[in-house]
């Protein structure tokens, strides 16, 4: 992710830019990732998603070699490359952050799938593709940065073939008027402004955009583990992270993960895989 203008779901930079997190080999990022992932599980993902999530997407969507697949908000490319390797599909990743695209292209060069995977710098609100260009689209934990989700979903619908499937993994929140303090603690921990939504909110917006909602899968146990690991990583390596991201942002993130964990335990936050399709 990165920086853009209000109206396409982004905003000007707040705190550290995603560029810092996209530099996977920086000293702080190496420490963070070693605290969260085992060597075999670290494919460059920058969310709470484990390899099991990606395997589930391949299985649930039936991704196969003949499919053309779009990865929206592809980050540093690891998940897209993993899915292409496991399924044999052709895949295009779109990412708005230049560093993310640069890292993605470096990873794909040594992956063995360079003939059927590419990563482009682009805006998901204005996808640089013709209508009906893809059979499947997916996104991993980036829906929260888009303010106008209906417009985003309509753009995804446009580039999907009739019957094409759209799946995204997203943190969902059920925050009420009594959760103002938690909301205030969550907001600074994000790198850019957040636009929370609930499962019901996502379902309504998908239908408004023209999708048919197929199924929603909620992840709790391993999601809680991942939130806890991210928080522990920031707390354990606070000094090293602060050298790269600044003391204030590091402190914000430590409190953010603590608040997030409280919401998970209270049943007010989850990670949901939401699957829908374009009619036709």
Regions found by a protein language model. Name each.
Residues 150-165:
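A short glycine-rich, Lys/Arg-flanked "PGG" loop and its adjoining helix->strand segment in the class I
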Residues 1-38:
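N-terminal, positively charged/glycine-rich alpha-helical extensions of SAM-dependent methyltransferases
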Residues 171-193:
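Short, glycine-/aromatic-enriched active-site segment of Class I SAM-dependent methyltransferases
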Residues 136-148:
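A short SAM/SAH-binding and catalytic strip from SAM-dependent methyltransferases
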Residues 215-280:
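Conserved Class I S-adenosyl-L-methionine
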Residues 70-72, 76-126:
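Class I SAM-dependent methyltransferase SAM/SAH-binding core
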Residues 125-136:
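A short acidic, Gly/Pro-enriched loop at the edge of an enzyme's catalytic core
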Residues 194-210:
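Short alpha-helix
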């Amino acid at each position: 992710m990165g920086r853009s203008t209000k109206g396409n779901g982004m905003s000007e930079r707040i705190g550290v830019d995603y560029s810092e997190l996209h530099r996977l080999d920086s000293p702080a990022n190496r420490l963070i990732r070693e605290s969260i992932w085992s060597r075999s599980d670290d494919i460059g993902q920058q969310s709470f998603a484990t390899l099991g999530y990606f395997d589930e997407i391949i299985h649930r969507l039936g991704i196969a070699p003949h499919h053309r697949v779009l990865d929206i908000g592809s980050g540093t490319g690891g998940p897209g490359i993993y899915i292409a390797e496991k399924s044999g599909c052709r895949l295009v990743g779109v990412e708005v952050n230049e560093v993310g695209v640069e890292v993605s292209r470096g990873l794909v060069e040594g992956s063995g799938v360079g003939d059927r995977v590419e990563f482009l710098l682009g805006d998901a609100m204005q996808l640089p593709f013709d209508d009906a260009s893809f059979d499947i689209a997916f996104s991993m934990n980036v829906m929260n940065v888009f303010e106008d989700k209906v417009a985003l979903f309509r753009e995804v619908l446009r580039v999907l073939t009739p019957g094409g499937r759209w799946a995204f993994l997203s943190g969902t929140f059920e925050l009420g008027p009594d959760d103002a303090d938690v909301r205030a603690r969550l907001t600074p921990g994000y790198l850019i402004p957040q636009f929370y939504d609930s499962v019901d909110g996502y379902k309504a917006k998908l239908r408004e955009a023209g999708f048919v909602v197929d199924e929603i899968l909620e992840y709790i146990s391993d999601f809680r583990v991942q939130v806890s690991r991210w928080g522990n990583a920031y707390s354990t390596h606070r000094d090293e992270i602060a050298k790269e991201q600044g003391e204030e942002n590091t402190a914000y993130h430590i409190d953010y993960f603590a608040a997030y964990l409280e919401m998970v335990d209270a049943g007010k936050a989850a990670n949901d895989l939401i699957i829908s399709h374009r009619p036709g």
